[in-house]
């Protein structure tokens, strides 16, 4: 059995769907929303790599590497902001984050 591009696209679609459901079904926890965004970015990266391998072009794989770098920085900055916000307010609920001034 050969693993083709359809298998990779199926896995990517499942991960993308899980990420979208995670965002829409959980509106209270910011950490779960950040993890759902990371799932969506992972699904996009799988698409880039799958099409890059199928077409024999390395541009998609390089772009996926850049997306992974930006996603790691986004996760680190987002979690750092949440830690500071939790220390100041004692909660990381979305309702509390929406009440911020500035």
From Swiss-Prot:
Which domain of life does the protein's organism represent? Bacteria
Name any GO cellular component annotation. NADH dehydrogenase complex
Does Cytoplasm appear among the keywords?
no
From the Swiss-Prot or TrEMBL record, state where the protein is found. Answer: Cell inner membrane
Extract the InterPro entries matched here: NADH_UbQ_OxRdtase_chain4L/K, NUOK/Mnh_C1-like
**Where do transmembrane segments lie in this chain?**
5-25, 31-51, 66-86
Per its record, the protein catalyses:
a quinone + NADH + 5 H(+)(in) = a quinol + NAD(+) + 4 H(+)(out)
Q: What keywords does the record list, in alphabetical order?
A: Cell inner membrane, Cell membrane, Membrane, NAD, Quinone, Translocase, Transmembrane, Transmembrane helix, Transport, Ubiquinone
> What are the recorded Gene Ontology BP terms?
ATP synthesis coupled electron transport
Q: How does the record classify its membrane topology? A: Multi-pass membrane protein
Q: Name one GO molecular function term.
A: quinone binding
Q: EC number(s) for this protein?
A: 7.1.1.-
Query: What is the protein's major site of localization?
Result: membrane
Oligomer and partners = NDH-1 is composed of 14 different subunits. Subunits NuoA, H, J, K, L, M, N constitute the membrane sector of the complex.
Question: What role does this protein play?
Answer: NDH-1 shuttles electrons from NADH, via FMN and iron-sulfur (Fe-S) centers, to quinones in the respiratory chain. The immediate electron acceptor for the enzyme in this species is believed to be ubiquinone. Couples the redox reaction to proton translocation (for every two electrons transferred, four hydrogen ions are translocated across the cytoplasmic membrane), and thus conserves the redox energy in a proton gradient.
Q: Which family does it belong to?
A: Belongs to the complex I subunit 4L family.
The name under which this protein is listed is NADH-quinone oxidoreductase subunit K
Q: Which gene encodes it?
A: nuoK
